[in-house]
């Protein structure tokens, strides 16, 4: 199947034009659209923060997320919000996590520092991870942390972070990642303990705080669990943030992938979700056209 192609003389896809001036798209207002910084900057496209923000504005997005704190002033200068911040850990940020008591001191300290920065800048969410399942995060030969032990440790750490975040009006969102795709370091994460949305949801349920929720990544959930719409309804009260990408491959939200995103977005509206939807796909072609298609597919 051939991928769809954008009009060659329309660099930014379907934004309306008034003379030679690009005009911001008006959206329906039921979905709060966000662009993930790393997908456009830390990949082959290497877009600057200004270009990402300009595209976000023109597409009718309200946020650019996951940019480092030193770039937040640029995001705000463009009239955008930052829906989600990183946890302050060195790359890969998901390797050393809350499932391993050995890393608790570092992870909790760094995450608390990000909570403070987020609170000071009106950023509502900070990401969290279970981490890899090995005793030494980077060493598969070091022995595995049992899933029950990893869950207990994550509950303990997440509860402390939620208590710290609550008076600062920040929410910690725990992300499930898939462990099946080993084709690319950002398409799948073999060894990550929290690879099951049911496992992560139970952790959040046990923490029992409005400031600890799920980051429901449709791409990862579809690969590991499937039954996306049923799980959105099942875990509605615990969902704090949404990520989307094409399945499989983490590419565009086009007709070469299997998720019908308009139905997913309508489900979010039906369950009363009012958070952000972050476009976190890795472009395989002209990002301008791919982003325009993705936002259009998700604007219900």
Protein language model regions, located:
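Cysteine-centered motifs
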Residues: 7-10
């Amino acid at each position: 199947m051939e991928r769809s192609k954008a009009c060659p003389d329309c660099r930014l896809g379907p934004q309306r034009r008034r003379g030679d001036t690009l005009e911001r798209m008006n959206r329906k207002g039921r979905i709060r659209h966000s662009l993930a910084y790393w997908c456009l900057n830390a990949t082959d496209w290497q877009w600057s923060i200004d270009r990402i923000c300009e595209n976000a504005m023109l597409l009718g997005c309200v946020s650019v997320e996951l940019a480092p704190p030193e770039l937040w002033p640029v995001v705000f200068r463009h009239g955008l919000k930052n829906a989600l911040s990183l946890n302050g850990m060195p790359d890969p940020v998901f390797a050393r996590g809350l499932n391993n008591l050995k890393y608790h001191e570092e992870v909790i300290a760094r995450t608390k520092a990000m909570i403070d920065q987020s609170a000071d800048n009106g950023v509502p969410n900070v990401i969290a991870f279970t981490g890899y399942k090995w005793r030494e995060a980077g060493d598969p030969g070091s022995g595995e942390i049992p899933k029950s032990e990893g869950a207990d440790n994550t509950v303990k750490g997440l509860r402390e972070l939620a208590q710290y975040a609550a008076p600062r009006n920040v929410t910690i969102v725990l992300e499930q990642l898939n462990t099946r795709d080993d084709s690319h370091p950002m398409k799948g994460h073999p060894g990550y303990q929290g690879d099951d949305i049911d496992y992560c949801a139970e952790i959040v349920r046990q923490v029992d705080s409005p400031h600890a929720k799920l980051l429901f990544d449709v791409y990862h959930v579809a690969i590991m669990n499937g039954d996306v719409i049923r799980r959105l309804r099942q875990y509605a009260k615990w969902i704090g943030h949404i990520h989307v990408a094409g399945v499989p491959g983490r590419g565009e939200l086009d007709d070469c992938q299997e998720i019908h995103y308009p139905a997913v977005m309508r489900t979010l509206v039906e369950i009363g979700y009012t958070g952000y939807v972050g476009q976190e796909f890795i472009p395989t072609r002209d990002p301008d056209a791919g982003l325009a298609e993705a936002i259009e597919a998700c604007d219900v």
